[in-house]
Amino acid sequence: MKYDAIKYIQLLVSLCILVGSLTNEVQGNLSSGIKVKSCLELFYTSNKTLTNGHYAIHTGLSLTPVYCDFQSDPPYVWTLVESFSRNRGIQTSKLPESINFRKPYYYNYPYNECTPQFQAYRLSHASMKSIYDSPRTTHWRATCNFDKKKKYPISHRDYMRVENCRYNIMAIYNAQPGCYIVDYVNVRGYTCKMCQLPIYVSPSYHVTFLSSRTYSYCQKWKFPSEYGFNPPESNFGYFSQYSIDHECSSSKDATTNYWFGGVYQPESKLISYKLL
């Protein structure tokens, strides 16, 4: 009888720990009665002390686990929608299901959707669209090796940020190349702000930015490249050819990370930020 009582107490303690964990996981979500659809919406409904990590948001009728970045890029808050290693993202990869990381977001190729991580992860098209279409989502960005960052805010070396209204990453699936205004891009230390640059995508390969071809297209901005024109250097995905000086392709385990998000701007207090 005494043994049963001890087991019962242990069970109650375990349940309390679990419920506490879940409450932290979805705070500002179920607890407030608001069905948040992105990490940015979660931040608006929280106590603003959230740290980077795994949370749950609503995508459609269900809760979806996601990785949130609240700290690296103020005043932006980001939801991770895809991440893959160079080994998986390279166009000739033979790894199982590597095709999932060679498709534009127009197509549904989820991978490890219930376990967000950085080596091989992609949300379903429906979950991506739910985050992308949420009212506060205004931008998408690409980063490199985010899982290896130890200090915030992060450096903006090998980083790209684009406004959704300038390039609809969920809808465009065939552009060879298209010229689009990019808010900010840095490749191997070379930066361009509010530039019109070529972004490539096709039904058979992931959206990518070919820095070595920028001097021939659009505004003809030059990103010095060790490869020159042929073969072109792929950045932030596709990786038909790549440079080990670009952080996303610096090693076989280097990761490329895609995010949807926007600026956190509390209505009660206008904050002045110098946006990159």
Regions found by a protein language model. Name each.
Residues 2-276:
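Mature extracellular or lumenal effector domains of secreted proteins
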